[in-house]
Amino acid sequence: QRQAAKYGRRESEIDYGTNPCSEIILRPKQFCNLSEVVVRADDTAESLQDKIELATILGTIQSCFTDFKGLGRQWSKNTEEERLLGVSLTGILDNAMLANKTKDSLPALLGSLRTGAVNVNRKWATMLNIEPSAAITCVKPSGTVSQLVDAASGIHPRHSEYYIRTVRADKKDPLTLFMT
C-alpha cells in the first residue's frame, strides 16, 4: 500500500497484490499493460526520452481497450479507473551513460525520464478524453524480451555468454509432446 501510494496517484486503502512476476502492483481483478524500451549502447538521454515518449503513447492508447468480453465488470472498472502503464527500460547496463552514473546522478536521470513519461501520459490522456494513468513506469527483469533483442536483462549486467532458462509448457501442448 505504501509503494502504491508513493506518488499520490493511487488509492492507499486498497489491498494490492502483484502480477505473476511481482513487478507491477495490481488491484484484485486487474491487468498489466507493459511497454518495453530497449536501451542501446549509443542511446543518449534525449534518445531514451524519445523512446519512452513513444512507449508511453502506445501504453496510453492501449489503456483505452477495456471491453473484456467474458470477464466480470470489475476487471473493466479497475482497468478504466487506473489505466496502468508499465513503461520500463531493458539493457540499462549495455549503455555506458547509464552504467557509469553515480548513486546521485542516476536517480536524477531516471527521475527526469519518469517525469517525461508522466507528462506525455497526461497530454495524451487529455487528447483521448480519459483520466491519466495511476502508475506509468516500472522496473522489471525482462529476461525473455532481452534475449529477443540482444540486450542485457532489465537492470542486470551480462554475466555469461550462455544462460540456463526454465521454460514451462502445458504437458498436452503438441510442442511439449514432441520434445519429451
Question: Residue ranges of each PLM-predicted region?
Answer:
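Function-dense linear segments that define catalytic or interfacial modules
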Residues: R2-A99, V167
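Internal maturation/activation junctions in enzymes
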Residues: T66-S76, G91, A96-P141
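Short, flexible loop/turn elements at secondary-structure junctions
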Residues: E36-A41, C138-K140, A152
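Short linear motifs in exposed loops
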Residues: L148-V149
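Active-site-proximal structural scaffolding
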Residues: R27-Q30, L54, L85, L113-A117, ...
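Catalytic or ion-translocation cores adjacent to nucleophile or general acid/base/metal-coordination motifs
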Residues: A152-T180
